[in-house]
Amino acid sequence: MDFQERDPPFLPESAQSSKPSSAQQASELWEVVEEPRVRLGTEGVMPERQEGHLLKKRKWPLKGWHKRYFVLEDGILHYATTRQDITKGKLHGSIDVRLSVMSINKKAQRIDLDTEDNIYHLKIKSQDLFQSWVAQLRAHRLAHRLDMPRGSLPSTAHRKVPGAQLPTAATASALPGLGPREKVSSWLRDSDGLDRCSHELSECQGKLQELHRLLQSLESLHRIPSAPVIPTHQASVTTERPKKGKRTSRMWCTQSFAKDDTIGRVGRLHGSVPNLSRYLESRDSSGTRGLPPTDYAHLQRSFWALAQKVHSSLSSVLAALTMERDQLRDMHQGSELSRMGVSEASTGQRRLHSLSTSSDTTADSFSSLNPEEQEALYMKGRELTPQLSQTSILSLADSHTEFFDACEVLLSASSSENEGSEEEESCTSEITTSLSEEMLDLRGAERCQKGGCVPGRPMGPPRRRCLPAASGPGADVSLWNILRNNIGKDLSKVSMPVQLNEPLNTLQRLCEELEYSSLLDQASRIADPCERMVYIAAFAVSAYSSTYHRAGCKPFNPVLGETYECERPDRGFRFISEQVSHHPPISACHAESENFAFWQDMKWKNKFWGKSLEIVPVGTVNVSLPRFGDHFEWNKVTSCIHNVLSGQRWIEHYGEVLIRNTQDSSCHCKITFCKAKYWSSNVHEVQGAVLSRSGRVLHRLFGKWHEGLYRGPTPGGQCIWKPNSMPPDHERNFGFTQFALELNELTAELKRSLPSTDTRLRPDQRYLEEGNIQAAEAQKRRIEQLQRDRRKVMEENNIVHQARFFRRQTDSSGKEWWVTNNTYWRLRAEPGYGNMDGAVLW
């Protein structure tokens, strides 16, 4: 970010020291602008908008100044490289001048704005322009001062829903007397409690904004020269004003509201309320000595009262959600639940889950309910989601102090681990804590909602939630000894130790791209072709989300003729893949569903460049939606693993994805995976747009490939997709998602149905999953030698390998691709692979 950490400008009265006279003179040139005093007759004066180019000091010392375009409006000073960037919303940062300590140097025509965390140094060339900027900054600070008495209590704090209006036990007890479908329908239609929850959460959000503003006002009053000195026994409420050259942390929080969570902060605010109460009592009983000014005491009382209201509102919401939980549990445990359709049970579970996580995604399917029930459930889910989603959290950021360029996060992928997910999930941390045990009891239905199950489809058998053995460290493997002789070579031809692998195969990684197949199901139900393109784009981005925690290991390379199947009735698709070529290595796959078809053939080129490993995919991803006759195709972007030999490995994806519908040219989509730069904060960011035939932007997309994709203007927007939360102890399970944990699972029934070439039967991969490293390494060497022997025999006899379940096609331009020959599932059913001879691969 563009700022330089240094001591605040010297105060004139603090310049009395034994330093040389030149230092004293230099310090006396700086003037700290005092807090504006309210004057009669100024209430109606509104500050003007000020904009123009200013010089801003660079982050690093001795690096000089650079020109930035600044806009001062409503007390917020935004800056960017050019005026066009301001218009487009591409800001480098923003400063709340109302809550900053302002210092000016008239001789040097400089302005310093101290936000406590950062100091922004500005220089203005023209004396007239300098005076104009100083005057406008003073005016905006004065306007904020005038508004403080009126705004100390927010307008949203006036209404409070009494606890008597919450759903009563009588309402809950009335449900068991109804039939199964009538009970669910009545529950879905009863929106009074959820309406109040929605309203309460909306008001809480406004109250939290006001609490943050009051908190910053208190801190601002506390650190300016005229601030009162609070006795040391009141340290629980405030801290001593920092002396020259020393900086202290904030009083009640350590991060800005723009970076912190929203409702997750309530726990800390609640902890501060008793301290404020004790402070006010002790203040009243301690006489007039050390009393703060009227404004300071008024702000403290306002903060205490508003925090009490936030706590009361959240208690009401918790009571309402607890009642919803009890109703769901009663229906789940009732004897008639076994006669209730799976679709209704999963729909009810999705409803409760949407309340607890405040997800901004639309429910995937309502096919099992009648139209009235569909509409009721849809409206209920959408009423709550805009208010606690990342969209609304991001929209608050413009009005607060800390806007960072944040180049530090480039050095470690873990520095922003699951930021978007944490922000959203922490919003309801206190509420969902009491629901977590019940949610675990119904985790199958929860996975259905988050993972993409379609209501009305069978749930399938229970899935495992961890690997048989924890992942072992691979630090004892000398990567440098392996790679130093292979710089610039294709690493797909280099044999690696098994410790560098994860217990999944490249064929299974192709299937992992279908983790969010619910996006394709959703697209198949949308009539607008441009809207369908938005969900196809979200699906293309979601394929990369699972790689965020997987930079430390690589998948097994499949041998020629190896296959993999994945039949998921709960998700509504079945998938097959096969290694159709060895040199070059090409993996082909095909998935089919009643709503979509998905296929691709992909080959990778791996290059080692000393400190990073670059993976360049070559091929095309295809998706067809039979309902509309659409055929979408797009390319994949380059992936790069950094710090291969030392430090914390992290992965990034960069390049441009072009999505087009070969059957409809009315729109197309371009998505850019931004490459990390040292001086930029766009690590892991994606930016894109759905464009019309003429190039007009129809939908603007933005987000991060590991956190979510949003539609609309930044920083707000509608959440189209966000990744599922990671399983517990995912670090001990190779960083696998829940879906990845299930890919290599092998049951006795499934083993009887698989062909002998299926990846699940590969011994080296199975041994690694079980933690037997020595056996895995021995089996890996044996399997690789068998493949070399087979290839030698085929070359000596001029035998060309023929793929078993895929066939190659070529167009008039010579482009080749692989498609399924539609024999896999037919042979699996009759005569069955257990009754057929297969290739011996291991």
UniProtKB/Swiss-Prot annotation:
Molecular function GO terms recorded: cholesterol binding; sterol transfer activity
Biased composition (Low complexity): 14-27, 354-369
Localization per Swiss-Prot or TrEMBL: Cytoplasm, Cytosol; Endoplasmic reticulum membrane; Cell membrane
Positions of modified residues (Phosphoserine): S217, S226, S256, S272
An annotated GO cellular component: autophagosome
Modified residues (Phosphothreonine): T171
Keyword annotations from UniProtKB, A to Z: Cell membrane, Cytoplasm, Endoplasmic reticulum, Lipid transport, Lipid-binding, Membrane, Phosphoprotein, Transport
Renumbered residue ranges of the record's region Disordered: 1-28, 330-369
Tissues in which the UniProt entry reports expression: Expressed in epithelium of small and large intestines (at protein level). Expressed in stomach, duodenum, jejunum, ascending colon, spleen, thymus, lymph node, trachea and leukocytes.
GO biological process terms on file: bile acid biosynthetic process; cellular response to cholesterol; positive regulation of proteasomal protein catabolic process; regulation of autophagy
PROSITE patterns membership: OSBP, PH_DOMAIN
InterPro entries: OSBP_sf, Oxysterol-bd, Oxysterol-bd_CS, PH-like_dom_sf, PH_8, PH_domain
Domain (PH): residue spans on this chain: 47-142
Annotated S-S bridges: none
Pfam families, per database record: Oxysterol_BP (PF01237), PH_8 (PF15409)
Family of the protein in this entry: Belongs to the OSBP family.
Official protein name in the record: Oxysterol-binding protein-related protein 7
Organism of this sequence: Homo sapiens (Human)
